[in-house]
From Swiss-Prot:
This is Signal peptidase complex subunit 2. Component of the signal peptidase complex (SPC) which catalyzes the cleavage of N-terminal signal sequences from nascent proteins as they are translocated into the lumen of the endoplasmic reticulum. Enhances the enzymatic activity of SPC and facilitates the interactions between different components of the translocation site. It is a multi-pass membrane protein. The chain crosses the membrane at residues 46-66, 73-93.
Amino acid sequence: MSDERITVVNKWDGPTVKNGLDEVVKKILNDKVGWTEQHNLMNLRLLISFIGVAFSAFACGYDFYAPFPKSKIVLLVCSVSYFICMGVLQLFQWYVEKDCFYEANEVDGKQTRKWAWSSEIKAHDDKYVLSAEFKKEGRSGQGKIIKSIGAYIDNDGEIMIPLVQREVDDLWARLIRSEQ
């Protein structure tokens, strides 16, 4: 993994660059550190979406068997419930997920450290903000790196994995040292 490069990204497209860098960070953490990614946030998002779609499907099915005048109340309740579920989903993404793209548990002897990695690139800005947070038995720590995407992407739009890996290793080591 020392001199690997990943697929070319359009360096002028912020969301594409963010997603590409996030994938590189995931790969580094899974390969080097050996963590297993947890998908709890994604599973909850899928559950909320499924409940909303189930309301919609029930409304369609009920309207098929009992046409409109009879199904008015059911259609109303299901429609309102669907939009409530979508509102809950949006609030979940804003306040619980908070741009988190990677969660993992690190087992260190008898104790388990829960890690959450997130990132962001603001619109019309070249700064990539990589944040890491861990929680372990009442203790926690967090850190972040703010760098221009130009530090990780060459002129051809290729993400340089060794440079990203150095930053991820540095952030991880800083957080481990700060805990002790």
